């Protein structure tokens, strides 16, 4: 098996996914798919390829007809699987062979037709069974619902994803076939349930699939709305709203258009026809019909029972009788209000073709034929001329006969028609299908007054102007008390800048309306000027240990003298300034300062530890807008708070004037080296304000 598959684009095991088919037919399907793959490299006659595909489809339908009441569903799914293989061969080929391989080029649209058919028929089975009083086995309903879910997801997605999840669908179909045979052998399926499956799951009309292939053979393209059972080319996604919409997964509220729009597919029951209790009252008529028969059910009048037309399967081609009967039952009916019933024309009957039926010829049938004539045998249908007055363009209804139902001939009520019976309602029917079905039309009378101004004007958003301040002007501004009238930096919303003691920074903050580019250039120049005016450090040797070069950090006395000397403005009314360290470099942060100094500098016994505490205290005061610098060191941790977290009082909402550190949650092991005091306090404050 593996040697036979070598060098081929399809494995032999792939065709084993077909359900209910013989090994001989699976081998023929494998050769057919290989032929389609080779058609992209070797030129074949498109008509010959179409004949091969048609022969394969007919054999699939005939073998599926032996699978019981669900033969129509198994036929659609097997054809869906076949055209998925055709589309896969098209996607593997980079070059477009166009009209030389019609079955592969049209496979995308045919897959959509089959997918929408399976979705519609599966939902139709649940609705019709509930409305007709027919019970289906729960296990079969569960498998049908899983297939319904897969097909619904395909109809809601893009066209290119129609082939996805092919293998799970075929596995579900195989399980459904085995379960159905088990129930049927055990006699657990009633006659009504089997008749219901035959009426709902009707096999696909074969010319519906072969028509686009014949069109492509002639070098043309089928219209886009042909590849849908609703006749719609656009894929819409109507959203349903309700209380149960959001109970399932996202997107489950979307409804495919095949479940909303009117159905224009031959062989499918109308969407509004859900109560078939009168038809299922005599299921023997449905069960005794030939295999793969099409059932056309109509209801000429609300007070009359349903009428059923049985059209046997015709594999030779298009069946005019089926098309005419289906169109007669699918179109809208206009009731004739005349008192005297109109008789159909019998002497001036004419022959009609499929083209004439499509152009709007009105058919008047007197009986339902037992066997439809094959194509080319000269079968004729009595019709009326299109030039006949509208009063004579009526069609007789197929009404069940009340007498004459014998057990030997159970379908006698289908073969009787009495158009002249007074109890028969004559209806006029239009057989031309509408090109565009209008679901809703909204009209309004023109108003004499001019329409109001409906221009949507969005409100203008006012964003505050944020003026970043340099770090050189940030730390000295902390020493200015609140009583002087100056604002503290940070935490204020508005378009105005934050005043500070530095004249350059104050000028930068005042120009709040300056353009951004000009503002940035002024900030850079301000930073350069402040970098040049750094106070000169003392040249006398200090007693600091090696590695304690901390930039511009000096003693508190030097800081106080520098601040007093450089102060501007009315200094007489200002209180004495606090002793603060000089500002840090512009491009230097606290963590960079720690990395540069090294761990040996931040020791508890270091001479610069008071200066470090003052620096950290000023930073914390500026970050959290405190009135006074918070104390960092205390003789005992027990004096700052309660022993247990339960005793910690909740914040009252007011401003804190003095911060209290939080005790560490875990003690440091005795065998490990104690962390530095300042860094330990910094981590404590960070954890405190983070919580």
Curated annotation (Swiss-Prot):
Disulfide bonds: none
Catalytic reaction annotation: S-ubiquitinyl-[E2 ubiquitin-conjugating enzyme]-L-cysteine + [acceptor protein]-L-lysine = [E2 ubiquitin-conjugating enzyme]-L-cysteine + N(6)-ubiquitinyl-[acceptor protein]-L-lysine
Subcellular location(s) per record: Host nucleus
EC number: 2.3.2.27
Annotated Polar residues bias: 655-677
GO BP annotations listed: bidirectional double-stranded viral DNA replication; DNA-templated viral transcription; regulation of DNA-templated transcription
Residues listed as glycosylation sites in the UniProt record: 366-367
Keyword S-adenosyl-L-methionine: no
Any Pfam family: Herpes_TAF50
UniProt biased composition (Basic residues): 515-531
Enzyme class: transferase
The keyword Transcription is assigned to this record: yes
InterPro entries, per database record: Herpes_TAF50 (IPR004998)
Main location: host cell
Gene Ontology cellular-component annotations: host cell nucleus
Keywords, sorted A to Z: Activator, DNA-binding, Early protein, Glycoprotein, Host nucleus, Transcription, Transcription regulation, Transferase
Low complexity biased stretches: 504-513, 539-556
The family this protein is said to belong to: Belongs to the herpesviridae TAF50 family.
Subunit-level organization: Homotetramer. Interacts with KTA/ORF57. Interacts with host PARP1; this interaction negatively regulates RTA/ORF50 transactivation activity. Interacts with host SMC5 and SMC6; these interactions remove the repressive chromatin structure to allow viral reactivation. Interacts with host POU2F1; this interaction enhances RTA/ORF50-mediated transactivation of several viral promoters including K-bZIP promoter.
Function: Transcriptional transactivator that is necessary and sufficient for reactivation of the virus from latency. Acts post-transcriptionally and transcriptionally to regulate viral lytic gene expression and synergistically with ORF57 activates certain early and late viral promoters including its own promoter. Autostimulation on its promoter is mediated by the formation of a ternary complex between ORF50 and the cellular components HGMB1 and POU2F1.
Stated name of the protein: Replication and transcription activator
Organism of provenance: Human herpesvirus 8 type P (isolate GK18) (HHV-8)
